[in-house]
Amino acid sequence: MNLILMGLPGAGKGTQAEQIVAKYNIPHISTGDMFRAAMKAETELGLQAKSFIDKGALVPDEVTIGIVRERLSQEDCIKGFLLDGFPRTVAQASALEEIMKDLGKKIDYVLNINVDSGLLLTRLTGRRICKECGATYHLEFNPPAKADVCDKCGGELYQRSDDNEETVANRLDVNIKQTKPLLDFYEELGYLQSINGEQDINKVFADIDVLIGGLA
């Protein structure tokens, strides 16, 4: 099974990715992991990526796509993979189609975890972190026993500056605008599957499981 996982920040992508790879024993491939592995192995493309990252520049598409091609050609991807964080643009998605064709494979599903942006705002702005031990809480979903105090060490809880409402709302807006052309592209190809991410975590996975179970 060859899957792509999509979803806005706060949609619960990471949790679902963990459950998918655990059950189906396929590699979870994120852009960051691919870059790190290629740089560590000092492949030609890995060294090229490193030169851009070290300068704080964006890695060009041709380098990123080359690294993706190398990764998807590896033995552990024979039975399938879960791509996370790639592609980000229609140009990258088109390049991925070419890679899959060259490998004699195809993408089975693009799983988009759908959550209303208002709920995402609540999820993302409610996070609080302990200044002392780094424990994470959520005002609505996982509140501390005593307001603003860590249950574990008694430290003070704070909100990260990039978790404030205005910053989060802007981040979501940018993500929605960037993601829409990609979703349209995959809908046209017939790959796109929308998953209701507003349900309980286990119910979200149950819906994914029903969908992809036949591919195993």
UniProtKB/Swiss-Prot annotation:
Pfam families recorded: ADK, ADK_lid
Annotated segments matching region NMP: 30-59
Catalytic activity: AMP + ATP = 2 ADP
Binding site for AMP: T31, R36, A57, L58, V59, G85, F86, P87, R88, Q92, R160, R171
Top EC class of this enzyme: transferase
Amino-acid positions noted as binding Zn(2+) in the UniProt annotation, renumbered to this chain: C130, C133, C150, C153
Record GO biological process: AMP salvage
Function: Catalyzes the reversible transfer of the terminal phosphate group between ATP and AMP. Plays an important role in cellular energy homeostasis and in adenine nucleotide metabolism.
Protein name: Adenylate kinase
Species annotation: Bacillus mycoides (strain KBAB4)
